[in-house]
């Protein structure tokens, strides 16, 4: 018996919707990253993007434990001298509510071209509305 290796023609992708309201950021991100990678499927193949599409709604109502709203700092650098910018989580969620979920999930998928393809299948929305009703997404419990 030959070992099964998935390829683009054998993969069947599904759409899932996740409600982030009241969910802890890291616990939500691990489940979403696993679905994006395709690890929830018995046909998972490491070198093929076999994951499904994930829609995250209510990202602005995500929960952080402890004092992380003040203590968790996100860094970015412009490339110039003294170009380091520090932004606490509570300021980042006001500027761009979807950024917390996107950054958490992006850190949990491979940092390669395959990982970029996986990340393109993630859609994060701040509120309860999304524009993917035509894909008939299934609810995914976290």
From Swiss-Prot:
HAMAP family in UniProt: Ribosomal_uL13
Keyword Iron among UniProt keywords: no
Family listed: Belongs to the universal ribosomal protein uL13 family.
One annotated GO biological process: negative regulation of translation
Gene3D superfamilies: Ribosomal protein L13
Protein name: Large ribosomal subunit protein uL13
UniProt xrefs under InterPro entries: Ribosomal_uL13, Ribosomal_uL13_bac-type, Ribosomal_uL13_CS, Ribosomal_uL13_sf
GO molecular function: mRNA binding; structural constituent of ribosome
Entry function: This protein is one of the early assembly proteins of the 50S ribosomal subunit, although it is not seen to bind rRNA by itself. It is important during the early stages of 50S assembly.
Keyword Ribosomal protein annotated: yes
A GO CC term attached to the entry: cytosolic large ribosomal subunit
Superkingdom to which the source organism belongs: Bacteria
Keywords: Ribonucleoprotein, Ribosomal protein
Oligomer status and interactors: Part of the 50S ribosomal subunit.
């Amino acid at each position: 018996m030959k070992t099964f290796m998935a390829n683009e023609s054998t993969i069947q992708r599904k759409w899932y919707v996740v409600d982030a309201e009241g969910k802890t950021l890291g616990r939500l991100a691990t489940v979403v990253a696993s679905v994006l990678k395709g690890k929830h499927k018995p046909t998972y193949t490491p070198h093929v993007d076999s994951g499904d599409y994930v829609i995250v709604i209510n990202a602005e109502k995500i929960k952080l434990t402890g004092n992380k709203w003040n203590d968790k700092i996100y860094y970015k650098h412009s490339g110039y001298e003294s170009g380091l910018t520090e932004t606490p989580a509570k300021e980042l969620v006001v500027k761009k509510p979807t950024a917390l979920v996107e950054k958490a999930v992006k850190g949990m998928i491979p940092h390669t071209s395959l990982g970029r393809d996986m990340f393109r299948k993630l859609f994060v929305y701040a509120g309860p509305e999304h524009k993917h009703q035509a894909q008939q997404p299934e609810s995914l419990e976290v």
